[in-house]
UniProtKB/Swiss-Prot annotation:
Pfam families, A to Z: FlgI
Example GO BP: bacterial-type flagellum-dependent cell motility
HAMAP family with a match to the protein in the record: FlgI
The protein, known as: Flagellar P-ring protein
NCBIfam families reported for this sequence: PRK05303.1
Organism of derivation: Syntrophus aciditrophicus (strain SB)
Function: Assembles around the rod to form the L-ring and probably protects the motor/basal body from shearing forces during rotation.
UniProt cross-references to InterPro entries, sorted A to Z: Flag_FlgI (IPR001782)
Keywords: Bacterial flagellum, Periplasm, Signal
Subcellular location: Periplasm; Bacterial flagellum basal body
Signal peptide: 1-25
Molecular function via GO: structural molecule activity
Family the entry assigns: Belongs to the FlgI family.
Subunit composition and interactions: The basal body constitutes a major portion of the flagellar organelle and consists of four rings (L,P,S, and M) mounted on a central rod.
């Protein structure tokens, strides 16, 4: 009876250790993808028409030449004629073809001006073939362009909001060619993690073998990939097995990372970030140098200054009347120094991110100051996380 209790206690302890090590669980479809099953990039060159005088300058040769070629294909000859239209813009059209998109399916596209058009507001994208990396046409884009901003102006002033030289064509791309995936003869495939991690990939293979072991055999390759092989005795449909596989809950682990954007002052930290015992004192030293221009004007009726090194003399009496005076421009320089008074804050070993933020907020630091502090803590060897600056 005593041995039984000890054995059960050991199982409970091991289970708790397993749970703490792996953290939370996520669906397999959210953390991994099948190798080779992916989107494909498409690109094309087109024209946007219907702009209210905000299109490309007529001096842009590629825009006028594109319009001329378009009209020629419509049976309108533009030889020896000058095009003067500012309601047209040359654009690049980009889109992503989903892995299993069928002929006739509709997807979105991004339209970006490549000329000097001020705005694509109110424009319509004319039929534009979209090609893949192999040069083949996979889709055709056409439709009204929608923007998230505007740009208007007159001869001497203008105003705008967000970015008006790029927009979207919602559901304006018609798929004309499919990408073939032969799953009927597939007996093995590879799962690639979206965030490579040795612990997660090992756990993924373990969960698949325990849950779907009668159908598949999973083997960890590295921190990025897990090979999956269909067993000979598997009589079920591969699509059904993949469907069950996608909904498996996999314990996910990740390394501690602190991401900082110096351009915007944004700092993002995961909950696993730990800091060793360190003392932090942060204060800003501001030095301001100001120069004012002043004019020194002599008193009224004072004698003029003499030339050379001789003092000024009264011509009638021969009396020395001082050096004389003249108008002089001088600089009045003022130097001011202001230093913030901050106390030293001691951060204990192994604190969580919540405690770190609370301690730094107590110092009154801003997000941009936090970037400098985290870099300094990392340099001191107290930050137990990877530091990424973007």
């Amino acid at each position: 009876m005593l041995l039984k209790k000890i054995f059960l206690t050991g199982i409970i302890v091991l289970d708790l250790v397993f749970f703490v090590s792996y953290g939370f669980a996520a669906r397999l479809k959210d953390i991994a993808s099948i190798s080779g099953v992916r989107e494909n990039q498409l690109i094309g060159y087109g024209l946007v028409v219907g702009l209210a005088g905000t299109g490309d300058d007529v001096k842009n040769g590629f825009t006028s030449e594109s319009l001329s070629n378009l009209l020629n294909r419509q049976g309108i000859s533009m030889k020896n004629k000058t095009l003067k239209a500012d309601n047209i813009a040359a654009v690049m059209v980009t889109s992503s073809l989903p892995a299993f998109a069928k002929i006739g399916a509709r997807i979105d596209a991004t339209v970006s001006s490549i000329g000097d058009a001020k705005s694509l507001h109110g424009g319509t994208l004319l039929m534009t073939p979209l090609r893949g990396v192999d040069g083949e046409i996979y889709a055709v884009a056409q439709g009204p362009v929608t923007l998230g901003g505007y740009a208007v102006g007159g001869a001497n002033s203008s105003t705008g909001k967000n970015h008006a030289s790029a927009g979207r064509v919602s559901s304006g791309v018609l798929v004309e060619r499919e990408l073939k995936y032969d799953f009927d003869r597939l007996r093995s495939f590879t799962l690639n993690l979206l965030q490579p991690d040795f612990t997660t990939s090992a756990c993924l293979a373990d969960v698949m073998n325990k849950t779907l072991g009668q159908h598949v055999e999973a083997k960890q390759v590295d921190s990025f990939s897990v090979d999956v092989r269909m067993k000979e005795a598997t009589g079920g449909n591969l699509m059904n097995i993949i469907s069950m596989m996608e909904n498996l809950d996999v314990p996910v682990d990740s390394k501690s990372v602190v991401v900082m954007n110096e351009k915007t002052g944004t700092v993002v930290m995961g909950e696993n970030v730990r800091i060793s015992t360190v003392a932090v004192a942060h204060g800003n030293l501001s030095i301001q140098i100001k120069e004012d221009i002043r004019v020194s004007q002599p008193l009224p009726f004072s004698p003029l200054s003499s030339k050379g090194n001789q003092p000024a003399m009264d011509k009638k009496t021969g009396t020395i009347v001082a050096p004389g005076g003249q108008t002089v421009v001088t600089l009045d320089t003022t130097v001011g120094i202001e230093e913030e008074k901050k106390q030293v804050m001691v951060i204990s070993k192994g604190v969580t991110i919540q405690e770190v933020v609370k301690a730094l907020n107590a110092l009154g630091v801003s997000p941009r100051d936090l970037i400098t502090i985290m870099q300094t803590i990392k340099a001191a060897g107290a930050l137990q996380a990877e530091l990424k600056i973007i």
